[in-house]
Amino acid sequence: DCGACKPAISYLVSEINDNRHREERHGRFINDRVHANIQNDGTFSVVPRIYGGVTSPDELRRIADVADKYEVPMVKITGGQRIDLLGIRKEDLPKVWEDLGMPSGHAYAKAVRTVKTCVGERFCRFGLDDSIATGIDLELAWEGVHTPHKVKAAVNGCPRNCAEASTKDIGLIAVEGGWQIRIGGAAGARVREGDILATVSTKAEAMRLSTVFLQHYRENAEYLERTYLYIERVGLDHVKEAVLDDTSGEPERLLERFRLARAAVVDPWLERNDPVHHNQFSELDREEVPA
C-alpha cells in the first residue's frame, strides 16, 4: 500500500502494455485522477494545451469567458508559453474543460508537457528555420504520452536560444545547414546544459531522432528519473549507441513502440462526459488533499 509505489507500478504497466489494460485509478496521485494540479487550498489549476505556444483570438476569448464565468481568481502566463487558470473547484473541472473546448495540457502529469518555441524565420531576422512549425509538429506527435518524469522540450530557430532549447529535456536548435539535437537539459532546482545527441540536415531526421530518444528514455529510465539524471547514470555514449545506430534495428523498434503508445492516447479531459467513477469530480474529500 505504498503511496509512491502505486504510481510507479501504474506507469510501468501502462508503458509495457501501451495503455491496453484496465487500470486501478486509486493507484494514481490526486492530480492524475482528476487531470488537474491541486493547489495549497484544495482548488485546482487548469492548463489547456497551446501547441508551440501559439494561440488565437478565438482561444483567448474562450479562456477569458471561462475565467469570468467561473470567477477564476488568477489567470497566469506560464514559463512554458501557456495559460494557467488557477483556483478552479474540483466539481467545476468538467464544465471548465467543456467550455474551453481545448485538449489537456498535461501540466499535472508525468508526460510530455510543452514544446516551447521562438518565432523563428517567420518573423525573426536571425531565424534560420521554422521553429514554430517544428515545435507544433513535435507537440502534436508527442502530446499525452506518459514518461518516467515530466518532459519539457523546445525548438530554437537559431543558436541564440530564445526558447531555451539548450536547457530542456529535448531541445532542437536550428543551425547553418540543419538541426542540432540536445538532450538532458534542465533549468529547475538544478541548471544543466543539454548534451549534443546529434546534428542532422533535415527537420524530419531531427524529429525522428528526438522521438527515438524519447522512447528510449520511456523504456529505460527509472520512475521519477529526469532525462538528465538518466543520461548521467548510464552515460551519453550508451544513449547514442541505442538511438543512433540504425544497423542494430533498435531505433526502428523504438519508433514502432512509440507509435503504439501515441496511438493509444486519449485526451483525459474527455472523461468529463464519462467519469471513471461516480465521485471522480465531486466535491473534494479532505483525505484527497496531500499533506
In which residue ranges do the predicted regions lie?
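Generic secondary-structure signature for well-ordered alpha-helical cores
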Residues: 14, 18, 65-72, 101-105, ...
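Conserved active-site/ligand-binding neighborhood in enzyme cores
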Residues: 34, 38, 49-55, 65-66, ...
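Mobile "lid/hinge" segments at catalytic clefts and subdomain interfaces of large enzymes
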Residues: 152, 157, 161, 166-226, ...
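Flexible, glycine/charged-enriched surface loops at secondary-structure junctions
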Residues: 19-25, 72-79, 147-151, 219-233, ...
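Intrinsically disordered, low-complexity polar/charged tails and linkers
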Residues: 26-41
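Charge-rich, low-complexity terminal tails
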Residues: 252-291
